[in-house]
Each structure stands twice: as structure tokens, then as C-alpha cells.
Amino acid sequence: MSQSSSDNKCFMVVKFLELPFMDEKNLYYCVHSSWIVHRTQEYVMVAFPLQNELSPSLFDMKYRQVRIGIMEYKTGKCPYEKILYPKIILNNITHFILQYNYLYKKSYILK
């Protein structure tokens, strides 16, 4: 998985209308094979690209959830439709499918 330095600046902020399940011991979750989310506040999550050192083989898939979220912000080159698999977008409210995974090497994620 190769990424340019500009890719690493991509991120998006989603505010959920329902609180996604979060394990207190694992604050990072895989949303797409190349992206993670990090909880910044109770209902707000930020998605970042994975660093090159990580690969989907490091994840144990647990389950999926459907949650309603509002896109608060995204960088201009952030293709969020490839990150959170939107199902329906109506009045800026999107149903997202969140694929939660435990991450084993959190120290590599956010540098």
C-alpha cells in the first residue's frame, strides 16, 4: 500500500447522531482497508489514512454497525465515499457502515 505525503494529510470529521460502540481499551478502529478512525469526543470521530507499515492483515474483523453521521469537515482530496461506505445521503446526513477492527500496532498509526 503506497501513499504520497499529501495522502497522509487527508482526513475527515464525522459527528454521529448515535454513539458508535467503542471499547475503552481500543480507541482506534479500521473503517476501510486503508483508513482508521479515532474518537476525539463522545460523538465525533476523525478518519485518517493508515501508515504504510500497517496492512489489513493486522486486523481481526469483529462486526459492522450502521450509524447516522453528519460530515463536519473533510480535506479537499479526501474521497470519503471510499472510507465510510455511505448508504444514503439526505440533507447532509449519511448512514455509514462502520467496520470495527481491533488494531494491534497503535503506535504506528498517528505519527
From Swiss-Prot:
Name the record gives this protein: Uncharacterized protein M4
Organism in which the protein naturally occurs: Microplitis demolitor bracovirus (isolate Webb) (MdBV)
